[in-house]
Amino acid sequence: MAPPHGEKSTEVKEEPSAVSSVDNRPISTIVFIIAMQTEALPLVNKFQLTEDVDSVFPKGVPWVRFYGNYKGFAINIVCPGKDPALGVDGVGTVSISLVTYASVQALKPDLIINAGTAGGFGAKGASIGDVFLSSEVAFHDRRIPIPVFDIYGVGSRKAFATPNLLKELNLKVGKLSTGDSLDMSPVDEAAIVANDATVKDMEA
């Protein structure tokens, strides 16, 4: 993960009557996708969740799920778990994409929240301990120097608008740049600047 100079995190809306802005479907099942279990544990404890010993995921995968109910919501926190050979957290865009897809298939959530620590840039207004909602995400390390493929590689996408969260929680908003390297090479830095990013992570 990137150094904890900011956080790409959010909170569950307290009222069970929360409604999805996408299709006005009432929100009842929420999945948090969090790359590292140490990042997830504060929420696991906050929501008093239980680890799923009879996994809903395919046999043999290291993915970990914590589940329970909180104020009328079915809460799930899913982590990629530990690499079987090396014992480290399965960070990066590939493992997080797989576990997110599997969570959608198995849990049918109404809302998915990708949360965790990230690096932030002071020149863009980020400070240690800030909580950001991502307004847009893009890659900074998918370099394909062919017309049109270069745009595909950057993969810039706008995030869902969450005006109620912004208003109620008074969070900061910024563009997020993601990639599979913790360090920041000069070429990555140039791409991050081009992405106009305030926040940098490894799992967006």
Model-identified regions with their sequence ranges:
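Active-site rim beta-loop-alpha module in soluble metabolic enzymes
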Residues: 147-204
